[in-house]
């Protein structure tokens, strides 16, 4: 494991700048997990530019999301509230209500220039931004369509991660009033499924054999929700859509979707793309893999393509960092890098997210701080994506509304360790039944324990001791000797549900409807 040194977190003794002068550059990716970021875990790949942010600032070791799904996570970010309060529960039925309070609106009202570029995925056009240009839905990796503020759509030629960065740098250089503070939200589609890499990196990592997670062949003993999921690399990863093994006669559930995606490449791009993947496909077809060999082949293809997309992402983060430094903006700018949630890289034999288990609830979070913050190293307190909104508001000198669920991270950025800092986090995932068939569930995570209640067509609990069982393989709920721990966690769960006014505390029927 590679990590930024935790030696001696320091608190600045300097007089801070007038808060109105702090800028905010918020870079968020989709499904980028800490396992594939070398300042967190250097087993797989190197991410030198992302690591630069941590080296120049802080790395949060216990950063989590409140609902591990793209749209709901983004709603939590904007509002500083859990899904039960912001109204965006899932990606299938929810539409975000932009008439509600969001931190960009409050920044805008205080004189900040605000911009949003890239993936929004909230089924509504953004409000609270002086400038925005967003993707429709998930967007496309190649030659993508953008929606502009006039409501029109247009295509852009190129690779999406490059284009979003180009547009962001153009706004920073040419479109903002340089006399005013700003907040720009740079939202990448990368590293979302199905991990289409840029042409220049097609051959990267092709000679790398990635090690299997120790629980890759997990049998899910004692964990009923894990048994019911549909996100298994072995069973559910599509050989065409996900691994690009596309050949004449291909007929998988997602073959037509894959063909639509790659149809966006122009003839020259398609020629290079097909030459690469057709050769891999021919080799794959000649091997006639089955069983565990096929599953492990799919894992290697998944890891290689995911790593290629991350490499492109890291390059583009470096472009933003270089620009900010060249313009002297790094000295009074908070630079944040995070993901909308974590992701499974073969742990438990899975891809995707959704579960409250560690790999998907946890998210990478690094920040490069304005020059008058001297704090460097690791921050170990429990933090959550509902904390971004109050943090940005306090940094801008704006009063944090009382109805926000999150808490400002500014004391932690100043090197403090408040004694009254939260000791537990609340989580609630709603989307079921859905594509990956992860049951609706809620729960709490403390420093040591995690308690989860699954509900819908079944109703049961799981309990994990994260110190003794960090990979969450041994469900302790109902086991002798854990009665006191369970009671304490149940009480804390009830307290948080009341605090956040989650109506699920009044019960849910077998159809998953809150009552």
Predicted feature locations:
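Formylglycine-dependent sulfatase
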Residues: 1-455, 459-461, 470-491, 495-498, ...
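Residues forming the ATP-binding cleft of Hanks-type serine/threonine protein kinase domains
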Residues: 467
């Amino acid at each position: 494991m590679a990590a930024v040194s935790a030696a001696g977190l320091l608190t600045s003794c300097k007089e801070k700048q007038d808060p109105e002068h702090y800028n905010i550059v918020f870079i968020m990716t989709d499904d980028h997990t800490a396992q594939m970021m070398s300042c967190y875990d250097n087993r797989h790949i190197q991410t030198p530019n992302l690591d630069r942010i941590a080296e120049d600032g802080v790395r949060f070791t216990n950063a989590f999301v409140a609902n591990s799904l793209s749209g709901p996570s983004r709603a939590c970010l904007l509002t500083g509230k859990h899904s039960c309060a912001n109204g965006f529960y899932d990606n299938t039925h929810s539409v975000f209500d932009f008439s509600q309070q969001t931190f960009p609106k409050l920044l805008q009202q205080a004189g900040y220039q605000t911009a949003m570029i890239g993936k929004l995925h909230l089924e509504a056009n953004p409000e609270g931004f002086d400038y925005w240009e967003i993707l429709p839905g998930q967007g496309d990796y190649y030659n993508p369509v953008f929606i502009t503020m006039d409501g029109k759509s247009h295509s852009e030629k190129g690779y999406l991660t490059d284009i979003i960065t180009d547009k962001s740098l153009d706004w920073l250089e040419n479109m903002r009033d340089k006399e005013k503070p700003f907040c720009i939200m740079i939202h990448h589609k990368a590293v979302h499924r199905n991990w289409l890499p840029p042409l220049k990196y097609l051959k990267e990592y092709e000679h790398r054999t990635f090690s299997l997670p120790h629980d890759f062949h997990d049998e899910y003993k004692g964990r009923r929700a894990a048994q019911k999921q549909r996100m298994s690399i072995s069973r559910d990863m599509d050989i065409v859509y996900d691994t690009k093994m596309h050949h004449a006669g291909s007929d998988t559930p997602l073959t037509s979707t894959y063909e639509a995606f790659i149809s966006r490449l122009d003839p020259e791009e398609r020629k290079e793309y097909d030459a690469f993947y057709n050769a891999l496909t021919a080799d794959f077809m000649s091997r006639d893999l089955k069983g565990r060999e096929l599953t492990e082949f799919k894992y290697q293809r998944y890891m290689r393509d995911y790593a290629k997309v991350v490499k492109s992402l890291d390059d583009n983060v470096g472009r933003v960092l270089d620009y900010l430094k060249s313009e002297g903006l790094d000295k009074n700018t908070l630079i944040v890098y995070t993901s909308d949630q974590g992701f499974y890289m073969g742990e438990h034999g899975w891809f995707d997210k959704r579960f409250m288990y560690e790999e998907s609830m946890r998210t990478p979070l690094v920040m490069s701080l304005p020059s008058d913050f001297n704090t460097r190293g690791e921050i170990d307190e429990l933090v959550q994506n509902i904390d971004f909104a109050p943090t940005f508001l306090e940094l801008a000198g704006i009063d944090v509304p009382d109805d926000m669920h999150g808490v400002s991270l500014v004391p932690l950025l100043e090197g403090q360790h408040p004694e009254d800092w939260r000791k537990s986090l609340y989580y609630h995932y709603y989307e079921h039944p859905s594509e990956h068939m992860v049951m609706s569930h809620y729960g709490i995570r403390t420093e040591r324990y995690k308690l989860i209640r699954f509900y819908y067509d079944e109703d049961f609990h799981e309990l994990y001791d994260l110190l003794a069982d960090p990979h969450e393989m041994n469900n302790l709920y109902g086991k002798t000797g854990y009665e006191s721990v369970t009671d304490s966690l149940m009480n804390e769960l009830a307290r948080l549900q009341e605090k956040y006014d989650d109506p699920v505390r009044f019960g849910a029927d077998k159809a998953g409807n809150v009552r």
